[in-house]
């Protein structure tokens, strides 16, 4: 939905990239008008590992378009994502990130310093993290 709002506000075309092709009809992965040579900015809500976002980039590039960057509302800033975006040569700009949210949450008393330490441990390796260890 964010991409549609941005496209509407800027009076630009909008396309939607599915995670998997439809299993009926034309079986499109990309819905909307995308022509070779178009310059595209991908709009996302959240970047975690970057996997699904970069699959969308690959699909758009396969259709002959140039992805000039990606914007997102939020990123956890996981090292795996930062490396993936660098390797894919996709500039990423976000409205906010993990560090900013932690700072505001701590400053406003929403969380305590101990919570920040726990969350920072989780952030180091979220796939293998276990609470209380």
Please provide the spans of the model-predicted regions.
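PRPP-dependent phosphoribosyltransferase catalytic core
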Residues: 58-133
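Short beta->alpha connector loops at strand-helix junctions that form conserved
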Residues: 18, 44, 96
